[in-house]
Amino acid sequence: MDNTSANSCTKAPQTAVQNRRKLLYGQKMAYIERAVDTRLERLLSSMGGVLIEGPRACGKTSTGLQHAKSSIRLDESPTVVQLAELDPQAVLQGDTPRLIDEWQLAPFLWNIIRHEIDDRQARGQFILSGSAAPTDDIRRHSGAGRFARLRMRPMTLTESRPSTAQVSLSSISASEQLTGVHSDLTYKDLAAEAVRGGWPALTNESIGDAMDFNASYCADLTSTDLQVSTGIRHDPVRMRRLMESLARNTATEATSGSLASDVAADGSGIDRNTIRIYLDSLSVVFALEEQPAWAVSLRSRTRLRKAAKIHF
């Protein structure tokens, strides 16, 4: 959950949360071009299907719809999932690429879609998007050779427009010379963007509205999303305190032990094993991501960092 502050995980007044949720989840807005658009097009031209994964509200559905020619949303109604169970082929029929949104609500579709791709022998057939990884199922094929995985995250400053995009990783990799690069953003502006977060729905909202949204998002995670996605009942108070600790320690090599100590300092004792279970649950809904330690050339004698950095 990039760019959110520890304060965003505190509980907002219930009426404010409800009003903000209606405003931000219900509004329609013009599509914002995303960094993954080009890669999604390339993957659709080379694979039978693409699986878009990422946290709720990061823009997966909008991006999928932008590239799809037909779609079905499994979270619209319980009857849609029932239809998928009774007649899976009805869900798969439509112009291609066909978007199947929140597919993890009907995980049995995975093997059916995989076989459909094999039968059609065509590329760019399906786009699957989901805000939670389905539980492990030994019967489910990996999808290798049929599906490409595409990870989406909240928007970068370039996507949300505050950045001038004068510097990019591709230009640095190409050894392009960078001269006269200047940004009008102040430290205050950057702090405001960090509080706002990279959610597409918040692009034109005030900082106050953004804080309400982020508080609501965290509250939904602790009260509903995690249990629905993992089947595990978590202590909402401990989970919220862990999330606050993760926000404080984001982009660091924090360990389960250090996080447990940090949470304990807030007055809630919790052991390392429980912390690990909670971290795994947050990873399932893509609210937490571990960045592997950077590895230099194998021939280099430079000492490698071994611990992953956590991003929340």
Q: Which residues does each PLM region occupy?
A:
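Accessory nucleic acid-recognition modules appended to NTPase machines
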Residues: 24-25, 203, 207-312
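Conserved lysine of the Walker
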Residues: 60
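Hydrophobic positions on the alpha1 helix immediately C-terminal to the Walker A/P-loop
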Residues: 63-64
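Conserved nucleotide-sensing/catalytic segment adjacent to the nucleotide-binding pocket
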Residues: 84-127
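Sensor-1/coupling segment of RecA-like P-loop NTPase cores
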Residues: 119-140, 282
